[in-house]
Amino acid sequence: LPDGKPISVYSRKHGFPEAERVTGPDLMLELFARDNGLRHYFYGGSPETLQMLEQKLRERYPHLQIAGMVSPPFRSLSAEEDAAEIEKINASGADIIWVGLGAPKQENWMYDHMDKVRGVMIGVGAGFDYHAGNIKRAPMWMQKLSLEWLYRLMQDPKRLFKRYLVTNTRYLWLTRTKRQ
């Protein structure tokens, strides 16, 4: 599920015509709205964000099954701590593990744990903060034009400048120079 426009365009050009952009926050709401019996686990965000997120989700989606919520520390976990976190996630019986650590940390975490975690892991970046009410999403017209990144950059330039302008430029350069 490509969350960014460049990835969806690249995917469609390389044999995946159905690869339309689906943002993590939008996917969350779509799946929460369905009363399908899925158990949801939330990994990431601050304790306050998770508390507010849980409150808002329980109000809006009373049928939603929350299997667990964990705010990991902002440091690397020891091997023992990591094993305990994975055991907690797996013991919860979660079907979907929403990972809100931000890019690229959440992608690295999911890659490192793909053979350990039972359930589908989905990286949602700032999705927890959006749905908890901590930060506002871009206006709908910007979302539809795939300019949400620009809105976020204007809101938090110090933190996002490197990610959006340096890293994304490098990605575009690599995709254009890759030989098929």
Q: Locations of the language-model features?
A:
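A short beta-strand/loop micro-motif in the catalytic core of glycosyltransferases
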Residues: 1-3
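Short gly/pro/ser/thr-enriched loop/turn and capping motifs at secondary-structure boundaries
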Residues: 7-9, 105, 127-132
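Conserved beta-alpha
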Residues: 8-88, 92
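A transmembrane-helix-recognition feature enriched in membrane-embedded lipid enzymes
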Residues: 9-13, 137-180
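Short Gly/Thr/Asp-enriched flexible loops that form oxyanion-binding sites at enzyme active sites
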Residues: 54, 107-116
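Conserved acidic residues
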Residues: 67, 95, 119
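Short, flexible loop segments at boundaries between secondary-structure elements
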Residues: 71-77, 119-155
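Proline-aspartate-enriched helix->loop->beta-strand connector
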Residues: 89-103
